[in-house]
Structures are given as C-alpha cells and as structure tokens.
UniProtKB/Swiss-Prot annotation:
Residue numbers binding [4Fe-4S] cluster: X347, C407, C410
PANTHER family: 3-ISOPROPYLMALATE DEHYDRATASE (PTHR43822:SF9), HOMOACONITASE, MITOCHONDRIAL-RELATED (PTHR43822)
Source organism of this protein record: Buchnera aphidicola subsp. Macrosiphoniella ludovicianae
Superkingdom, taxonomy of origin: Bacteria
Protein name as catalogued: 3-isopropylmalate dehydratase large subunit
Cofactor note: Binds 1 [4Fe-4S] cluster per subunit.
Amino acid sequence: MNKTLYQKIYDSHIIHEEKNNTSILYIDLHLLHEVTSPQAFYSLRQKRRMVRQPKKTFATMDHNVSTHNRDINGSGSMAKIQMEQLRKNCDEFNISLYDINNPNQGIVHVIAPEKGMTLPGMTIVCGDSHTSTHGAFGALSFGIGTSEVEHVLATQTLKQQRFKNMKIEIIGQIPKFISAKDIILFIIGKXGSSIGSGYVVEFCGNVIETMSMEERMTICNMAIEMGAKSGLIAPDKTTYAYLKNKIYSPYGVFWEKSLDFWQTLKSDKDAFFDKIFTIDISNLAPQITWGTNPDQVISIDEKIPNYETFSSLTQRNLAKSACKYMGLKKESYLTNISIDKVFIGSXTNARIEDLRLAAKILKNKKISNNVQAIVVPGSGSVKRQAEREGLDKIFINAGFEWRLPGCSMCLGMNRDRLNVGERCASXSNRNFEGRQGRGGRT
C-alpha cells in the first residue's frame, strides 16, 4: 500500500493499535514551557510517578518572561510562580531547561529547530497549539492538553486517532515583497479557518521547494489556524543543510544513516489524499487580517468586505461582530486606519530571516512618534546573530525598541500587551478578541 508522509510517520510509531482507528504512539520529543506543565508535574507527584524519558524532554521559559529584563519578577506574581515551578520541576525530574538566565532561552518553537532537536520522522508534542511548526522538518508534531502532558511525561506515549490526509500544492512564482506569512494567510482566507479540521495537511509544490526552512516553519506554524491537527513538509536538501552541525543533530556515521532514513520520508507517488488543493500565488498581493479570526483576510489594497452580501448568516454575523469589535466599517480600506503599536516577533515570525526582512524595509526610515514599536527576537541565538549583523541598530534608529527573547505580545500573558481599544500591526499568528490584551485590536 502506498502511503502519505503522515501515514509513514504515524505507522512507524505505533505501539498498540486499537480497532476504532486509534493507536498508542511513541513520542520522540516532548517540549515543555512554564504555562501548561505545572499541573502535569503536580499530578505526577500525587501518583508517585517519574518522568519516563527525561533525555527526550526539554523545557524553556517563554510565555511569561519579561522582554525588558531577566528579572523573574518582571511579569507579575503569577508568572513568577509558574517560572519558579518549572525550574523546580526540571531540577527534580532531571529535565534540561533553558531558563530566563540561559543565553539560549527563547520561544520553544524557535529553540528546538535551531538547536537540531527537531528532526525528520519524529513525533513531537508540546502543551502549545503551534507545535505544528516542527512539521516543516517532516516531523509529526501537534499541541496537547495538560492531562496529555502528564501522560507523555509518565509513559513517553500518547493515544491518538488517525486523521485524514490533505495535500495543498502551492505553485507559481512568488511575487516581489510576498512572504511565507502572506501565502499561508491567503490560504486560510480563501479556504476558511475550519477547512483543515480532521486532517493533517501536507504542503508541497514548487513554491514550498524554493522556501528556506524558516519560511517553511511559518507555513506549518499556522496550519493550526486552518483547523488542521498539524502541517507537514517532506524533508529535502534544504532541510538537511539546515540541520547539519546543529548541537543536537546526528553526527558522523549517525548523520549518514539519518540521511538515508530521511530520504524515505515523502509521500509515495500514488498515495491517497482525502482532499487535494492546488493554489497559484503568482499574482498574490500582501495579506492582512481585518477581523477577529485568522480567515478574515484581505489583500492590503482591498476593501473590508461588505458582510451584508455574504450568503451565510453565520458568516454575516461573525463579520459584523468583528467589525464592531475592531471599530471598522464595511467597504473601508485598512490603509486609512491609524495604529498604536507594532509587534515583530512570535513563534511565527521571530527568526533571523524575519528580522532581516523587516530591517531591510526599515533601514533609513523613522516610525511615527505616535506609534510604539517593539522587536522581540525568538531566541538568544537569534538576538546575538541580529546584533552581529547590526540589525538591532537599524531597528533602534527607526524608533523600535529592541527587546529580549520571549513570546511577548503574541499573547497577553506578560507585560507586553495592548490597552483597551489600541490597534496593533502584529507579526503573530492570531487576531482573536483580547489575544494581545483585553480590548486590544490585532
């Protein structure tokens, strides 16, 4: 039987298969952060259980950390408790931790790939929805809940149903000024935020083949925004070049053996997909969200749609509600709307290539005095590389604040947040109501 990439990885990790299309899978890598892990460790202690595979478990502090300084008190009392608890848990259970004082600390979905922890063919889980990022390497990766975090800690396994297979082939020539973020926003905008529900999505096509690993990570990061369980991209020479000589990558004879295996990680020629879409992005314009859902997307030169013309009553009501929350009028242009803040960062767009692109646009320019703008590198490694290249100076000279690594304004769990009614142009992945702060407009 010919198999898809998803089926190959799933099948190779089955420990026990049940009759209802559900299996117990072995988990190769378990990523932790300070927000969704405390209850799991508490439960382990209550049941007097140990962590099954500490060497296959890695933790960092990212959601709550202050990007102003490395003071553990910098994001409030609750954040301090969670970070202190993670430190205690990792020490007790012998788990590697990049805490706030580690020079390599940063966003978990930035650190794991850049250090070579994320490898093709792996199963990877984390108590965070954007774990799909790691699918860019041909790894089956997805977010899990806190009770599942506990189960993986205790057993290094997880019960998972089989999902259907979707293929999205992206073709054409990438227009000037178009990024991977524009491409995935366009796909979500056209297909909807639930089109991937019940599926693992494999992205392919000549556009994907020409992308760097960091661009591919942006694509897979937002697979969850189209409702998918995860996103996948088959590994290729670009993947291998990125991983070579990383700290946790295989080396020597193990590298050669890994390459032999990785080259088998692709969908067979006649593998069956439940749904297939082909999308030509040759004429794509820059994309921007206008509402409170990732599929409420338009080109930057388009008007906000007239929701009265929508055939679906549900979509009409959602769009009307979004316009009200965002303080926008139908059939108006977003280019005429002033903003209060700008955020460059997040697990979607805080890598070195993202910062290079932003710095190229900002060089010799100055932002308005009425706008607060911040740049938050995705990790200590990204920050140091950007500073070696002088990108920090470009941002600072343009009027941006150059911050320390963390999740920052991607979500309102730290001191970086929007005030009620403020508008933010954000490089993050979600524009939900209150996502960046109560009453904030993304």
